[in-house]
């Protein structure tokens, strides 16, 4: 039986019993967070057939809690000179392809009200759900198929691309994007899946460490600091 091509429609549904046959698509993106949604709408906007998968029951959970619930979605001073990196050339090429002004234009297109808080930080006037809704609307307009509550069991490199065993059944694709994020906030669904896939395909893994943590001090140290200020 040949693999059937699905019509590019958005489906915000859990997998069904009949989804057990081999299906084919051009692009599979694993992870429906900010990166996965942007990747999906960009690829589909260029005419690719895109299937976006996530093991959670909702897309963009971290978007909803970001910025204290108002989503600090970009910074007006997002420039290569303001980044620290072992490979500054990557930053230059990435920001040249898509700038903060491109995203601000997308926000304006959808009529999302926002303001500058300080030092170029841009926040929604209302709620983070405005940004999530914007990304989902963009995905809808270009025909991204979103499937939630979908787990990936195995990934295999094949001649035509990649073969995935999922709770949807087998999925074959030409291009595969892993956009599952890091390990932070496991209560929102973060796992080490992306690291496992990277290791499976022979990529070098660097030790992870926290990038944003609370700073706490003891009462005794606080009293000492009062006399040094």
Model-flagged regions — what are they?
Residues 30, 65, 178-179:
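Redox-cofactor binding/interface segments in oxidoreductases and associated redox assembly factors
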Residues 45-63:
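Glycine-rich FAD pyrophosphate-binding loop
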Residues 70-115:
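Glycine-rich active-site loop/strand segments that organize a redox cofactor
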């Amino acid at each position: 039986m040949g693999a059937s091509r699905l019509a590019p429609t958005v489906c915000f549904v859990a997998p069904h019993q009949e989804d057990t046959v081999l299906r084919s698509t051009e692009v599979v993106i694993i992870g429906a967070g900010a990166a996965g949604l942007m990747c999906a709408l960009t690829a589909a906007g260029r005419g690719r057939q895109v299937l976006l998968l996530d093991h959670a029951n909702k897309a963009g959970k971290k978007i909803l809690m970001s910025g204290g619930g108002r989503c600090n979605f970009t910074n007006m001073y997002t420039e290569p000179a303001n980044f620290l990196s072992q490979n500054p050339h990557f930053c230059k090429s990435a920001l040249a392809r898509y700038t903060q002004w491109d995203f601000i234009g997308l926000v304006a297109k959808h009529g999302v009200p926002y303001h500058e808080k300080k030092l170029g930080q841009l926040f929604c006037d209302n709620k983070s759900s405005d940004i999530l809704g914007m990304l989902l609307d963009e995905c809808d307009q270009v025909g991204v198929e979103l499937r939630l509550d979908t787990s990936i069991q195995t990934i295999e490199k094949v001649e035509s691309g990649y073969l995935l065993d999922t709770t949807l059944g087998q999925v074959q694709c030409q291009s595969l994007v892993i956009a599952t994020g890091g390990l932070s906030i496991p209560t929102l669904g973060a796992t080490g899946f992306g690291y496992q896939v990277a290791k499976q395909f022979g990529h070098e893994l660097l030790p992870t460490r926290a990038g944003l943590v609370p700073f706490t001090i003891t009462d005794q140290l606080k009293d000492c600091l009062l006399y040094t200020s």
